């Protein structure tokens, strides 16, 4: 495809990181540090961005979550999305990191506002993507020694299964396509 003319859809000078389109393509979800709510316990910091949505044709953006929610993946019906959290400023390239700020995968229900932690392993878990069945998801984890692709049924961390088994070089930046 030849593409089209680029159109600016946001006007804030903050760093913005695109994460996903809505399933119908009408909305872009992105992370940025624009406006932490006054009641937020997080210190405003460029690496601890909030989640925003903006119409794909441009317009006013709105804050979806005040907490860092990165690399989101919507369920087919668009009622829930998976995301990786960010609890602190650890270097994302550090290998074999286990601490209280390692990333976990969460499920967010857009109707109720409920966040449900999906991964329970103490190390890094990243880049969630809903599986076609809608009942499980794929993600990256260092649980097997280096980053590999794992699959887990929603809400069943004990049933997580390693899909790839690379030993020398980790899998980075998992993506999915139809």
Predicted regions and their residues:
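Short coil/turn segments that connect the beta-strands within blades of beta-propeller domains
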Residues: 24-26, 77-79, 133-135
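A flexible loop/linker signature enriched in serine peptidases of the S9 family
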Residues: 1, 9-17, 22, 26-52, ...
